[in-house]
Amino acid sequence: MATTTTTIKAEAPSRLTPEHAIYDLRTAATPRISPNGKRIAFVLGETSRETDKPSSHIWIIDPDGANARQLTRTGTSHSSPAWSPDGQTLAFVSQRDGAKPNAICLLPMDGGEARELVRHRAMPGSLAWSPDGSTLACTLPVDPENPREEERAKDAPPPVRVVRRIDYKQDNRGFLNDTRMQVMLVSAENGEIRQLTREAVDHTEPQWSPDGRTIAAKVSNRNGMHSQLALVDVATGAVEVVGPEDGVLATWAWSRDGSFILFDGEDRNIAYTDYFRYDLASGERRRLTDDLPFSSESGFPTISSPAQPVWLDDRIALVHGIEHGASGLWTIDSESGDVAEVVQWEATHAGLSTDLSANLIVQAWSSLEGTGELAVFDRAAGETRIITSFNEAFFAETPPAKWEAFSIQRGGEMIEAWLFMPHDFDPTGSYPVVLDVHGGPHGNYGYSFNLGAQVMADAGMLVVASNPRGSGTYGRHFANLVRGDWGGEDWLDLLAVLDEVLERPYADADRTGIYGYSYGGYMTSWAIGQTDRFKAAVCGAPVFDMESFYGTSDIGHDFGEEQWGGTPQERMAWMIERSPATYAHKAKTPTLIVHGEADERCPIGQGEQMFVALKKTGVDVEFVRYPGGSHLMLRGGPVSHRIDYYTRVSDWLRKYLAVDR
């Protein structure tokens, strides 16, 4: 699909170090285009060297990239911009000082200061205006034992925690018990708030029906591993749930007349989703597609929102997805289920916002050569433009890695991969090679900015990132090949991709390393027990012992059964066979283990077990623990921790792969 790219050359290029990237790259995100298509509101995030903390503000820009300006000044973090139906007011969430620092604010677009509507201790999410502009729906965490968010006395001991539900904790949120996200209705006139939903399950991403009488939201069960569509009566709060409890819901949208809902989901969690139509009058739920060619952008729990479908007319919807690692737009016929590609890019886009005419589509943009900008697709002209240049100067003075996309055939499947090279790559030289393994296992690499690979390439290494069987964006069949086969054919795919790179004269087969996080951490810990070909390994937040992971991870009891084919009692022999812990005594590779201490997804105990096993074996091993770090610490952890993480990863590999750059 792609060949080696060209890069901007600077006379004296700066090093693409973790510190430089994290402090100096800015990120434009969450774009929202006004109803008339004349203005785009978005969030611009950056990190201050003075405070060592991230901040974000609401900006506005014209669709052609002109007249960019900052709208917010008060507060340190702003998010969730949402236009009123008439386009005259912009709602957003602002973090400010005080015991209840999170405010929903309204900014009149014809001039004047933002008005605080209501404040909360927790961060409101998913702002959505009612069709008549009188009310904002949002989501807030509600603790049934402390619904008014009353502060505990400073000298009071922590309360005793009594647990009766299996999903009592969640990564990036910590201990929950019955605290769950609920839909709230806030008066845009006076800030009066009403709790609409009450069942102790998470309700997210509320969408109003065209007549304003019903809200469609996502109900998440078992920490988001399963989800359903919930139709909530605005007057009474009564809830109708659509779809099986063991199913999944990815994206959804009301039809223009409110008679049906188009949604992307599946009857059970099988790593891939398809489109359905739910007719409100008849209650019929009809499958429209079977085995989509792309993966929908369904968002990531606690981090990002889904890219919801938008209507082009009464029948055809436009949706965003990712196929073979590349973002694109497709149309879905809500009657026939016919799918047609509109455009595809060698880039990764996020979100999906359009004006009332559905001609201009604005999304956040990232590629292998840049990141943090906004892209506008003109549907009538068929043209895509990057309308911001926040990081242009950064990449002019700090050239990104060169790259090459390639693929191999193995076991009847095509395995795609990307090779990253130093920006000043010399084909007559000799370079160590690092195998970079993604998480998931249904994650994927593709056409997005990969900071880890960029840092390693800048440090003088070749980095090969691939999508072995089990990866997402290649269809249902490919994704499901990893189920019940962790460390099997996927491992052999990775080795085959590495061997392909090592055939090149500039790749040094005597200096190979492996790096991975989450499922990539599993594969790294698996690798060092299977072979001694790697001279260095970096293992981030691994699954090391399947049996203990099952009972201690926030999703192990559900995800584990789906992936491994049953409970430990049913699959113990297989779990022992496929656990890296079983083979750790064979390891010889110098290994760095990096792990967040508050990781509830792959708990710190997995890293602890691995460290002890390797230490007892006599391996040169180091264990780095990040206090307070969740499984998502690389996306939103303390700035100093993220810089430390990427620096240690690079330094460990440079040391043991003899990189003298």
Predicted stretch roles:
Residues 20-56:
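Beta-strand-rich domains and repeat architectures in extracellular enzymes and scaffolds
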Residues 17-22, 69-72, 115-118, 192-197, ...:
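A short beta-strand motif characteristic of beta-propeller blades
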Residues 390-510, 517, 549-558:
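Cap/lid segment of the alpha/beta-hydrolase catalytic domain
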Residues 2-9, 55-56, 141-186, 288-291, ...:
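Predominantly five- to eight-bladed beta-propeller fold
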Residues 62-66, 108-112, 187-191, 233-237, ...:
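Short loop/turn segments that connect beta-strands within beta-propeller blades
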Residues 53-57, 100-104, 146-148, 180-182, ...:
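Structural motif
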Residues 25-40, 75-93, 114, 119-136, ...:
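Conserved beta-propeller blade repeats
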Residues 468-661:
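Active-site-proximal cap/loop segments of hydrolase catalytic domains
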